[in-house]
Amino acid sequence: MKTVRLRAAAKINLYLEILGVRPDNFHELVMVLQSVDLADTVTLRAAPTTRVSCSHPLVPNDRTNLAVRAVEVLQKHTGIDEGVEIVIEKRIPVASGLAGGSTDAAAVLAGLNVLWDLGLTQRQLQSLGAQIGSDIPFCVTGGTALAMGRGEVLSPLPALKGVYLVLAKLADLQVSTAWAYQTYRREYLSEGTAPRARTSALLSAVASQEVARIAPLLHNDLERAVLPAYPQVSALREHLVSAGALGAMMSGSGPAVFGLARDRAHAEAVCAVLAGEPGLELFVCKTQQAGILMEESESSDL
């Protein structure tokens, strides 16, 4: 039996601006996205029918799981009716703004491309992923990218290599992505907004590879919706700054926040300051230039 095992990287937003509402009711976005080395492990094995298992109680095992949707999209595209067993080992916090569900789905697309010997290109996998969720095309490739449209129109940026950060999330808190966007739309969105000058400033800072230039330019429109409703997220963001982070921001729709650091030692020092807080998930992470990494592909007669 053939087995494929992959590492599916988390994503952070260095920039997220909501420009307006599209005719298809999605939001028009400008984002700068970055993969980090916090990752789930996704294992795929041939099976008569598709099933998914995960030890995390909040991860569904039905077709509401984007990983199952990824199988269905590939089956429809290729005409293959085989099933697959999907085992997800979660390290990325669930419902946290780190694209955990999307990156698992991206791993399923990439893994089935190997398991079923499909020969699809990365661009084809991205196009299929866009049918499932807006973050999935980025998760397929990973790295550092400018994302526009609803997030699926990607332009690679100069690789942001070896940047350390601290990810922090209150363990018992989840924020609905749909709620965050709808709240922003209702309370803050004005039609015809043009991208702010800080977009180009951040792109220049990313190209410079200087974390000290990037940190003050972090921006996320969704903080305006989420932080007033979840003051504990705002407090955690401020705690990262007071602990010494160069800059801190909520990722995506939250509630995970991250703080940028000068180097690994600095990140570990910031993490140590927060380590005593109860109910807090903390990770020292580093940027990486891949979304999905193949760990293992093997065949067995068992």
Curated annotation (Swiss-Prot):
A GO BP term, please?
isopentenyl diphosphate biosynthetic process, methylerythritol 4-phosphate pathway
Q: Which residue positions are annotated as catalytic?
A: 11, 135
What SUPFAM superfamilies does this protein map onto? GHMP Kinase, C-terminal domain (SSF55060), Ribosomal protein S5 domain 2-like (SSF54211)
MF-aspect GO terms: 4-(cytidine 5'-diphospho)-2-C-methyl-D-erythritol kinase activity; ATP binding
- Please list the residues that bind ATP: 93-103
Give the pathway. Answer: Isoprenoid biosynthesis; isopentenyl diphosphate biosynthesis via DXP pathway; isopentenyl diphosphate from 1-deoxy-D-xylulose 5-phosphate: step 3/6
EC numbers for this chain: 2.7.1.148
Question: What are the record keywords, sorted?
Answer: ATP-binding, Isoprene biosynthesis, Kinase, Nucleotide-binding, Transferase
Q: Which reactions fall under this protein's catalytic activity? A: 4-CDP-2-C-methyl-D-erythritol + ATP = 4-CDP-2-C-methyl-D-erythritol 2-phosphate + ADP + H(+)
In terms of Pfam families, this protein maps to: GHMP_kinases_C, GHMP_kinases_N
All disulfide bonds of the chain are: none
Gene3D superfamilies linked: 3.30.230.10, GHMP kinase, C-terminal domain
The family classification in the record reads:
Belongs to the GHMP kinase family. IspE subfamily.
PANTHER family recorded: 4-DIPHOSPHOCYTIDYL-2-C-METHYL-D-ERYTHRITOL KINASE, CHLOROPLASTIC (PTHR43527:SF2)
Q: What does this protein do?
A: Catalyzes the phosphorylation of the position 2 hydroxy group of 4-diphosphocytidyl-2C-methyl-D-erythritol.
What is the protein's given name? 4-diphosphocytidyl-2-C-methyl-D-erythritol kinase
